[in-house]
Amino acid sequence: MKATLFALLYGDYPELHKRLLGSLARYAPRNRIEVRLWLNTVSSETKARVKMLGFQSFDSAENLPKYTVMRRLFHGSPIKTPWIIWFDDDSYIERFDWFRQTEAVLRKHPEVSCLGEPWRHEWFPGQWDFVTGCPWYAGLPPALNGGNPGIIFPIGAYFWLKTEAILRLDWPHEDIAHAHNGGDYFFAEAMRQQNMRFLPFNHGVAINSASRRGRNEVPIGCTVDVREVPRRFETGKSPSTILNRKRRQFP
């Protein structure tokens, strides 16, 4: 199995980037994984490290939104592998058998289109109306999670995704390409609408393992400003909100 690994690095955080880049150099097999990096206004130290490691990179002097970057990376150059892997720069590989174990799970479940760490989101006001206006909406009513309309989604800081799913859904589509907050759960809903399966699984990757640095913007599709909902961000922990605080347990 071969994959193209994409990662978005941004800002003057050379130690954070050193951690991710070092883990890729140690644990991402070069004969199986092609690495493509997007560098959003990063430090000269990070640029030098990327060059030293020989990773392909795209340098931006502007701090572009995440889904704009995804759109350019996924559709700007041909992807020749059946799978893509995504990393935010605050996630990193911490186990030597990360690739082997994940590959084994995917071979065991060929019907799966996406793999990652699961979280539950309950739709904010206006978001389901946004869903029904999307080109991938196929008429399914909202799923009920915990008794309320919502979606189980892969945390956007690290996931595996079939290349054919990106092309079929034209993801990220133009309606969200300008945004930063909320695309991961809309992608999960797009897959559900199109009968694509998400498999909750993570072996060997530390996710969101840094204090929050990103934009604090209203989530995609919201008709109310929910940014006043208290958030808790702890180093080494994934973020949670009041509406999203209970993590679902999977076998």
Give the positions of each predicted feature:
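C-terminal catalytic/acceptor-binding lobe
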Residues: 174-251
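Glycine-rich, basic loop-to-helix element that forms the pyrophosphate-binding segment
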Residues: 61-76
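N-proximal low-complexity "stem/linker" segments adjacent to membrane-targeting elements
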Residues: 1-22
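A conserved acidic beta->alpha catalytic loop
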Residues: 38-47
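Short, acidic, metal-binding catalytic loop of nucleotide-sugar glycosyltransferases
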Residues: 19-32
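Short beta-strand-to-loop acidic/aromatic patch adjacent to the donor-nucleotide binding site
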Residues: 81-92
